[in-house]
């Protein structure tokens, strides 16, 4: 029988939490992200999420469909928007050939068009292209890169594309495994600013202590299968943990 990596741990994730997962190598930080994302099953315990909660996970292994440009790949973040675009195009094509303006079917078609336009606007359909370009540029891409195939970029740059997709999806929970690994200083600063104003919850693993300090407002330490939860960013957590250990020794 194997040894449990975690035992009896419990914590609650609230909107606005920006949690830094820390611990020694092999403590289970990336594994806990995979448990939260349901990429791996646990041998026991339960996780409870709101029914409609949307979760995005930046994994270390990224697999893109070949033949897409950077923009086309980034637009994969907007599956429903792209579907509605096709439906609107089809309805408008039908309307150009119709002359039965008084018929019930024509009225239904107009209503369908109105409903889809409202849904499209609600999803941000009129803004997503500009948002995509802004985030790609924030992560270091130039406009002239947008129409280049993703196949021509290194793994580090492909990770930036995947990160852009996650940021564009506006998930309720964002799970990030070493998001700064392949970023330059300018892109890291941009990402810090973006994540600080993120409306959902964030759980991240990073060896970049300054990034943790600048982004997180809560630290969870994993040690020997247990977790220790502090409502502090990384540096303040270190001070608090030191004070606690000093008191325990007294």
Residue ranges of model-derived segments:
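ABC ATP-binding cassette signature C-motif
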Residues: 1-249
